[in-house]
Amino acid sequence: MLLFWMWWALLAVFRAFPGIDIYFSQLFFVGADCDATAAAGNICGGFPYRDVAAFDLLRTVFFRLPYVVAIVMVWKLVECYQQHGATFNAERAQKLKVALGTLLIGPVLLVNVVLKEHWGRPRPIQTDIFGGALHFAEAGSLAGKCVSNCSFVSGEAASAGWLFCLLLFVPKSLRYAVAAPLAAISILTPAMRLSFGAHYLSDVVLGWLSSLVVFAALLALTESQQHQKNSEI
């Protein structure tokens, strides 16, 4: 519940102070002289990090990584259910279902199907204060004119948040070795989306946190059901 209310509290802060989003995007925006065809008052320029080949390659790798991990998890879940009786690992199956359920409900459905397709917030690069054609819309606003695959919230940040959740399921013997690179990927992914002008700070923060909210809710639900079953035995 704490994560749930934290998400809404952060949304309220970003809505009340939209200058936070504008400020952090301005850190990565480089202005340029407009050409003769530009209308008077237009702002010209761009986000140079999006044109760096190394960053673009990293973004591609980080974008695909959660879904590669998910495919491996599906395979492991199928393996679990090929076992029966004493050889069936119920705990592993439960963890895999929570992890895959979080990815499906959070980044896939909530973020990419519901929020990004219906909230209409233009990305920074689409916004007139950063050289685009659309007006700025604050976090959570329905007034934006983006038509599809919009800025609120970041799907890649949500997937990165999901990867971070998996640390809880990593065996203790591997946790220290895996924690640092996984945490780095989880933080770098939303940071790059911000630096590319693809999302505002609120989009990446709320997208990342949304996966933790869904993960915590599913984990609490499964643990409650397991506790209820144990009490009935």
Curated annotation (Swiss-Prot):
Q: In which pathway does it act?
A: Bacterial outer membrane biogenesis; LPS lipid A biosynthesis
Swiss-Prot/TrEMBL keywords: Antibiotic resistance, Cell inner membrane, Cell membrane, Hydrolase, Lipid A biosynthesis, Lipid biosynthesis, Lipid metabolism, Lipopolysaccharide biosynthesis, Membrane, Transmembrane, Transmembrane helix
Q: Tell me where it mainly resides.
A: membrane
Where does the UniProt annotation locate this protein? Answer: Cell inner membrane
Q: Which Pfam families match?
A: PAP2
Q: Which family does it belong to?
A: Belongs to the lipid A LpxF 4'-phosphatase family.
The EC number on file is 3.1.-.-
* Ranges annotated as spanning the membrane: 2-22, 61-81, 95-115, 150-170, 177-197, 201-221
Q: InterPro entries attached here?
A: P_Acid_Pase_2/haloperoxi_sf (IPR036938), P_Acid_Pase_2/haloperoxidase (IPR000326)
Any other comment in the entry?
In R.leguminosarum strain 3841 lipid A lacks phosphate groups, and both tetra- and pentaacylated species exist; the same is probably true of this strain.
Q: What class of enzyme is it?
A: hydrolase
| Protein name as it appears in the record | Lipid A 4'-phosphatase
**Function field:** Removes the 4'-phosphate moiety from lipid IV(A) (a tetraacylated precursor of lipid A).
Q: Does the keyword Methyltransferase apply?
A: no
GO (cellular component) term, any one: plasma membrane
* Gene3D superfamilies assigned: Phosphatidic acid phosphatase type 2/haloperoxidase
Membrane topology per record = Multi-pass membrane protein
Q: Which residues lie on this side of the membrane: Extracellular?
A: 23-60, 116-149, 198-200
**GO terms for MF:** hydrolase activity
Entry-linked SUPFAM superfamilies? Acid phosphatase/Vanadium-dependent haloperoxidase
Q: Does the keyword Oxidoreductase apply?
A: no
- Which GO terms fall under biological process for this protein? lipid A biosynthetic process; lipopolysaccharide biosynthetic process; response to antibiotic
For the Cytoplasmic compartment, the record's topological domain ranges are 1, 82-94, 171-176, 222-233
